[in-house]
Amino acid sequence: MIPVLLRDAEQSAALSVCTSYTFRKHKMTKQTKWFNFECSTEKLSLPYSHQIYCHTHELPLTWDLLANSNIFLSKKYLEALEKAAPSNMTCHFIGVFRGNELVAIALSQFLDLNSIDCYGNKNQVKHLSLKNYLFRKYSSRILVMGNSMLSGQNACAVSGTANIPQVLHALSLAADELKAIFKNKGIDMHLTSFKDFQATEVGDFKMPAFKDDLRFSVQPNMVLSIREEWKSEQDYINAMSKKYRTQFKRSRTKAKGIEKKELGLDEIRAQENKLQELYLHVASNAPFNTFYLPKHHFTVLKEKLQSAFMLVGYFMDEQLIGFKTMISNGDVLDTYFLGYDDTIQKEKMLYLNMLYDMTAHAIHNGYSKIIFGRTALEIKSSIGAKPEEMVGLMKHSSKIINPFLPLFFNYLEPKTVWQERNPFQTSSQ
């Protein structure tokens, strides 16, 4: 498997002048748009440059002016990531300048998959396979321009006056510089990837800097759009067909006896050990992991994001048996990590109930959509989420391997086969 969702560099920040290109995630009503803007001849003539930052305290004062439409590029989120990233992840922060003006910001993550056990408890046999050998030798050190902990385009935010092709070219040069920095530390990068973009946005990468990159897609991002007529959870239930109303009622009946509570900072800190146990119970049973969260991750997120980060505990007989986390990103609700006791999960349909609870939270609080992310595609579609294809770009550092990357990728990352469900009534029902 090639990990496409993709911390400890101490080198000084480097400034490199380059031509550059820019793209922007801009929050407008209910959707993310990709904008091209015309710039004056005077602005286009100014040199574009990039600067790589190792620490958030180095970021320019105007950083958050560009990040205001995406919490996952805000300084407070990046501070949390800097303080509580997975042990095998190295983050850098990139500013793109037109002259002295900051016109784009970006996040990069280096993942060293050789330093962790990527395969879950049920997949130990894969350690001996040819596939694992090829993965370890040729695709285990990855530089991601984006955020491997999330689904969607959280790589970059750009000023409305910047030129997209110039910003993208600057980011390409920043990626090259990062690879050189790691190489000087004895780390040869295998893969470089820009993630995740909608299919309509990939055309912006048609430029020489990306001509040798593989365009790829893996599991889709599952997104539930909240209909305007849904003013309550009951409205959502009423929109379902009989089969899925029955599924909803059955799951709620199974969950009787479970109490739910949103935990504050002190409660999250007090429950760190149990939260980690429940999280690892889920993660270790996944077929593949690119990282594992540290125990203090949720505590730090709550410290930094405050009310924008929500951790809801599920209790039975006053014992924590599961939890879910969510992050408020403007009018979009992003689901984050969760954990549960698998034996209780099966009996109480805990995971399905968590999905319903997140949907109810989004409806009650006026969100336009929920980002459910990848994995568990079929069950997420059964509560109304629809697949959105995300496209990434990938390039291998070996000029010999790179032309064969499509074959290599398809072998290590086979297409996921699943059946999409539609829980809502059709016009004929």
What are these language model-derived features?
Residues M1-L5, A13-T41, M145, N163-G257:
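Acyl-donor-binding surface of acyltransferase catalytic domains
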Residues W34-N36, A270-N273, D334, L350-L352, ...:
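Short, flexible segments with low predicted structural confidence
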Residues T90-C91, L113-D212, V332-G392:
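Acyl-donor binding region in acyl/amide transferases
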